[in-house]
């Protein structure tokens, strides 16, 4: 993306605009402008920023370094920038690995916690079902005992009920008991 100038160009003539053509006035871009960029555009911007940094380094180096009264020409290669870039990438990858491991561990702990809670609730549910069965059996036994006692109960005989009424009541309660179970 560098502009080619005819003849020899001094470092002071090289500007960032030669490397990064910009259509917007400086300071007019906001963060939201960059939020929706595609990875390809982001990569282009990253390279443009790197080129701008290299341009500033080159201009300062060319201004300060001269050999036999003329500027020393420096070629900026990928190898000069690569160690810094590689180190940054390595640090970022390392941080990403740590964050990913932390996320996996949290997810694993959450899954284990939910599994334990599920097992606990299932055992409580089984205990409650067993208790329900015990209570149903106890209810049936009490109804049976009550019905055995009814024909001989003095209190009921005084109320004017006959043993026939008691037998019908007993049959009715048995039917109700089987319908409810």
From Swiss-Prot:
Keywords, comma-separated and alphabetical: DNA-binding, Isopeptide bond, Nucleus, Phosphoprotein, Repressor, Transcription, Transcription regulation, Ubl conjugation
PROSITE patterns, alphabetically?
Answer: BZIP, BZIP_BASIC
Report the residue ranges that make up the bZIP domain in this protein: 86-149
Which molecular function terms from Gene Ontology are attached? DNA-binding transcription factor activity, RNA polymerase II-specific; RNA polymerase II cis-regulatory region sequence-specific DNA binding
UniProt GO BP: regulation of transcription by RNA polymerase II
Give me the ranges of the annotated region Basic motif: 88-110
* Record carries keyword Ubl conjugation: yes
Q: Which portions of the sequence form the region Leucine-zipper?
A: 114-142
- Report residue spans for region: Disordered: 76-97
A GO cellular component annotation in the UniProt record: nucleus
Q: Which Gene3D superfamilies match?
A: 1.20.5.170
* Residues the record lists as Phosphothreonine modifications: 162
Q: What InterPro entries does the entry give?
A: AP-1 (IPR000837), bZIP (IPR004827), bZIP_sf (IPR046347)
Location relative to the cell: Nucleus
What CDD domains does this protein's entry cite?
Answer: bZIP_ATF3 (cd14722)
Q: What does this protein do?
A: This protein binds the cAMP response element (CRE) (consensus: 5'-GTGACGT[AC][AG]-3'), a sequence present in many viral and cellular promoters. Represses transcription from promoters with ATF sites. It may repress transcription by stabilizing the binding of inhibitory cofactors at the promoter.
- Oligomer status and interactors: Binds DNA as a homodimer or a heterodimer. Interacts with KAT5; promoting KAT5 autoacetylation and KAT5 deubiquitination by USP7.
- Identify this protein by name: Cyclic AMP-dependent transcription factor ATF-3
Please tell me the species this chain comes from. Bos taurus (Bovine)
Gene it is expressed from: ATF3
């Amino acid at each position: 993306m560098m502009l080619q100038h005819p003849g020899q160009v001094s470092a002071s003539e090289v500007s960032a605009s030669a490397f990064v053509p910009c259509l917007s006035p400086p300071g007019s871009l906001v963060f939201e402008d960059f939020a929706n960029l595609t990875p390809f555009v982001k990569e282009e911007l990253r390279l443009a920023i790197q080129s701008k940094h290299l341009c500033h380094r080159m201009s300062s180096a060319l201004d300060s370094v001269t050999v036999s009264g003329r500027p020393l020409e420096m070629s900026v290669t990928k190898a000069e920038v690569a160690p810094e870039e590689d180190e940054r990438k390595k640090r970022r990858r390392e941080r990403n690995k740590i964050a990913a491991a932390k996320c996996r561990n949290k997810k694993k702990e959450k899954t284990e916690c939910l599994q334990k809670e599920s097992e606990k609730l299932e055992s409580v549910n089984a205990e409650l079902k067993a208790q329900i069965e015990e209570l149903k059996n106890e209810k049936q036994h009490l109804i049976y005992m009550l019905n055995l006692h009814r024909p001989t109960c003095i209190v009921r005989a005084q109320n004017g009920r006959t043993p026939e009424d008691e037998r019908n009541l007993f049959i009715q309660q048995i039917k109700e008991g089987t319908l409810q179970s």
